[in-house]
């Protein structure tokens, strides 16, 4: 049986609000859609942190668990938890094999965390990952720049995922949006 992949997460900080959206598609290999309603965006740490994953589903659950443990260990300090998780992820021979990326955010900070040790904070308050990530990122930047007065963070997140779903075959329109 092939690898299961789950893709396209978009996150935005906008006008004091924050939202993260993920589509529901899980694809086995490059040919078969196995699930349409997966939940790839979650609230963690008593609802104060959002986390979303793109990549292998089983690997992502391992990383969610590991990140939540780091949040508890560092009392909700998002940046410290992300850095410590990235160090552990990169430094452990078994964890290095995990194929997933995470976006984590709270009301003030948003970070991309990867297994190669990157912990990246965007300049513009927008991040997107997964197969439709570039489409969602482009749409989100345009919406934030040109329609920001008229849209909420949640609306930007949902619209960006919808546009990605129109273009990317690995992204569907079963969109879940979480806000803080």
Curated annotation (Swiss-Prot):
Keywords: Allosteric enzyme, Cytoplasm, Hydrolase, Metal-binding, Protease, Sodium, Threonine protease
Domain of life: Bacteria
GO biological process terms on file: proteolysis involved in protein catabolic process
Gene Ontology CC: HslUV protease complex; proteasome core complex
Catalytic activity: ATP-dependent cleavage of peptide bonds with broad specificity
Subunit-structure text: A double ring-shaped homohexamer of HslV is capped on each side by a ring-shaped HslU homohexamer. The assembly of the HslU/HslV complex is dependent on binding of ATP.
Family: Belongs to the peptidase T1B family. HslV subfamily.
Protein name (database record): ATP-dependent protease subunit HslV
Species annotation: Bacillus cereus (strain Q1)
Encoding gene, per UniProt annotation: hslV
């Amino acid at each position: 049986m092939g690898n299961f992949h789950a893709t396209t997460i978009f996150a935005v900080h906008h006008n004091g609000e924050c939202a993260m959206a993920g589509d529901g598609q899980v694809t086995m290999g490059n040919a078969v859609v196995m699930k349409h309603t997966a939940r790839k965006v979650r609230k963690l740490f008593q609802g104060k942190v959002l986390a979303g994953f793109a990549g292998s589903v089983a690997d992502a659950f391992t990383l969610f668990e590991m990140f939540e443990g780091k949040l508890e260990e560092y009392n909700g300090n998002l940046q410290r938890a992300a850095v410590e998780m990235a160090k552990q992820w990169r430094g452990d021979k078994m964890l290095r094999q995990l194929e997933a990326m995470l976006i984590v955010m709270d009301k003030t900070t948003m970070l991309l965390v990867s297994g190669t040790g990157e912990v990246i904070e965007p300049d513009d308050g927008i991040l997107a990952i997964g197969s439709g990530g570039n489409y969602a990122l482009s749409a989100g930047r345009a919406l934030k720049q040109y329609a920001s007065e008229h849209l909420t963070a949640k609306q930007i997140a949902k619209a960006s995922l919808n546009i990605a779903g129109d273009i990317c075959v690995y992204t569907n329109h079963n969109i879940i949006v979480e806000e803080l």
